[in-house]
Amino acid sequence: MKAYLETIVVAQKEGGDVSTSVSQIMIEFIDAYAYNKFTETFDAYEKGPKFEIYRTLLPIDY
């Protein structure tokens, strides 16, 4: 089974400028159980003092 993971990071630099970055990867799982186990701890959003992270996970074939 495969899944598409997109991660967007929005960070505030010194001086107030905002920086963004995006990564896109394909993740291969052994089976649906491994995928489900991964999604149990998957965090779609994180926030720190000067950054935010947004994640999207989409199953490709289940």
From Swiss-Prot:
Lineage top rank: taxon: Viruses
Pfam families: Phage_blade
InterPro entries with a match to the protein in the record: Phage_blade
Record's protein name: Uncharacterized 7.2 kDa protein in alt-Gp30 intergenic region
Originating species: Enterobacteria phage T4 (Bacteriophage T4)
Gene: y12D
